[in-house]
Amino acid sequence: MAKFGRLTPIRFLVLGVLVLAATSWAQKRSPIAEQIAKAYGLDSLGQVEAIRYTFNLELPGRNVSHSWFWEPKTGKISYEGKDKDGKPVKVTFVQSELKGDSPVVKDKIDWLFVNDNYWLVFPFHVYWDSPGAEVQEMGVQKLPLGKGSGKLVKVQYPKGGYTPGDTWDMYVGSDGRIKEFVYHRGNPKSPVPGIVIVTWAGYKKAGPLLFSTDHRGTADGKPVRISFSNVAVKLVGSDTWINAQ
C-alpha cells in the first residue's frame, strides 16, 4: 500500500476548536474501520495524486469557507481563505515540515486543514487512527436523526490530549456507507460543542473515491450544516481534474 502524509500529531477540530488525541501505531488497525474505509475507496487512494475541495460551515449568524489543495502522498497543502484574524490569505506548505514558530502554525491554518480534512475523508482517518483508539461494533441501532437504522460503530480515543475520551458514533449502512454521525465531547470543561449530530448525505464520486458532501444536523441543539463544494481529484500521471458527481 502506498504511503501517505499522515496528519501528525493527530488533531481533530470540531467546528473549529482544536482537539488532540494520542495514538499508538504499534497496535493493530481495526477490521471494521478498514471495511468502512474501503467503501470510500481506501484501496484506490494510491491512484490519487491530488484532491481539491472547499469546506463550508454554516451556523446561525456565521458562514465560513476554506478552499484546499492536498497531495496525500507528499503532504503538500495549499489553502485559500482567512486566517485566525479574518484576513484573506493564500499559502502553500508541507505539514510534516512545519515548525512551531511557522506563520502557518501561528495562524492556525494547519489546524483548519486537519479539521476540514477529517470531515472530508473521516473514514480514512478512523482507519489510520484505529491502532490508538477503541473501535467497537455495537449492533444495529435506530438512527439518531432520520428514519431507519444502521450498524453503530463507536470510536473512542484514549485518555489524553486536551479533550480526553472523545467519542465518535458512526451509523453505517449495509453498503458500508456512513448514514449519520454523532460526536460526544469527552471533557466537560472543553470549549468544543458537547454533542454534534449530523447526517452523511450528498454522496458523490470523484475518480475512485467516494465523498459525503452534505452534513446537516445540530451542535449542542443549534442548527449546523457542513458541506463540501468544488470537490475533485487528479489521478497519478494525469493533468485532468475529475469533478465529484
Spans of model-derived segments:
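N-terminal secretory signal peptides that target proteins for export/translocation
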Residues: 1-9
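Bacterial N-terminal signal peptides
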Residues: 11-21
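Flexible, processing/modification-adjacent segments and terminal tails
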Residues: 25-35, 96-166, 188-192, 244-245
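Intrinsically disordered terminal and processing segments
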Residues: 28-31, 39-43, 86, 90, ...
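N-terminal mature ectodomain segment of secretory-pathway/periplasmic proteins
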Residues: 31-106, 133, 137-140
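Tryptophan-centric aromatic hotspots in well-structured domains and transmembrane helices
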Residues: 45, 70-72, 119, 168, ...
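Gly/Pro-enriched, hydrophobic low-complexity segments
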Residues: 147-244
